Amino acid sequence: MTQFKKTITTIFWVGEGATEENKYIHNRSSYWDDNWMKHYGGVDSPLNRKGWLPAAFTPKQNPFYVALPFAEVDGDGNLKEIAKKIPGFGQNAGPLTRNRWVEIRYKGKSCFAQWQDVGPNGEDDFDWVFGSAKKPKNKWGLKAGLDISPATAQYLSIVDSDTTEWRFVDEKDVPDGPWKAIITRS
């Protein structure tokens, strides 16, 4: 497990439309999946929920997900040189970042989620995500360093945006909870 980092945290979701509020970035696709909304099963709106899930459908992927502002590959799919510094590099053939587990803590309560997208508003903030930077590079809007899904926000009772703490955890250390009902392996 890594040390907790404190940051402004905002809510985003699969299928979120592009608006001024999110710098005109739509979330029908993710950094790794051009068909994220289809593979997820639909729009994961924070409205009309049934428990931790959207009321209209059961997701095909984990509804507890986050975005962090680093991608190990560039836009052409080539491994970035700095990605070789990611803890665990070379230990397996899978992605270094996608599906990785994150613990988010808010007012003494923890929630666990899988890393499913890159952001908020950046893909090259290695020092924030894996290094010793105390805050993210993001200078836009609230200067958030973490985006969380509606299920994650709901579990933690975060209504819009707030300050949370986060850290990476190994899958074997993730406790049972609603975040383990559907685990994303793609």
Predicted regions and their residues:
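Secreted/periplasmic proteins
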Residues: 1-186
